[in-house]
């Protein structure tokens, strides 16, 4: 456990940032899964879900939650599955 005041604060901010990042990453994964299932079942709202999933992947990439190459790979797989 840190003794210095700034280190104590840093631990707190790191924990909150970690929770935020995990939440955003989970939301991205859920959006991608929903888009995949909508594409495979040929649902009516698959285009809307696909756009939302791509938006979530881009946001995760911009905030360095996932690498940009991985984001491109995910988007490419979704788009090719939608054809």
Curated annotation (Swiss-Prot):
Q: Which domain of life is it from?
A: Bacteria
Gene3D superfamilies according to UniProt: Ribosomal protein S20
Q: Which GO terms describe its biological process?
A: translation
InterPro entries attached to this UniProt entry = Ribosomal_bS20, Ribosomal_bS20_sf
The terms describing its cellular component in GO are:
cytosol; small ribosomal subunit
| Presence of the UniProt keyword Isomerase in the record | no
Provide a Gene Ontology MF annotation, just one. structural constituent of ribosome
Query: Per the record, which residues fall in region Disordered?
Result: 1-21
Q: Is-annotated flag, keyword Hydrolase?
A: no
Q: Which Pfam families does the protein's record reference?
A: Ribosomal_S20p
- UniProtKB keywords: Ribonucleoprotein, Ribosomal protein, RNA-binding, rRNA-binding
Basic and acidic residues bias spans: 12-21
**Physiological role:** Binds directly to 16S ribosomal RNA.
Would you identify the family this protein belongs to, as annotated?
Belongs to the bacterial ribosomal protein bS20 family.
Q: What is this protein called?
A: Small ribosomal subunit protein bS20
Question: Per the UniProt entry, what species is this protein from, by scientific name?
Answer: Staphylococcus epidermidis (strain ATCC 35984 / DSM 28319 / BCRC 17069 / CCUG 31568 / BM 3577 / RP62A)
